[in-house]
Amino acid sequence: MKKRNLLLAALLLILVAPSFAAKVDTLLIKSPSMNKDVQVVVVTPDAALGKKAVACPAIYLLHGYGGNAKTWIGIKPNLPQIADEKGIIFVCPDGKNSWYWDSPKDPS
């Protein structure tokens, strides 16, 4: 009897607990202006996926010098949960070891 009640309680908790289905992808995007591929991590909320997809705003998260495209997922592992809760697409491009990308002295 106790095992059954414990099992039912566990199943109820699983059914009631919120589930987050945001999709985390690591992509290579071709940049014609930089003449190279740029690695990007994209966190897409469930609301922007599937047959009933809706438009969602995007926030670009830029890492600091020495980081990479996966830095923000390491800093904030709950980004998929936030994406689902707020309906936001997070885009995390890899800027390599640069301060900014539009330098006239270094176009690459």
What spans do the regions from the language model cover?
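Intrinsically disordered, low-complexity segments enriched in polar/charged small residues
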Residues: L8-A9, N68
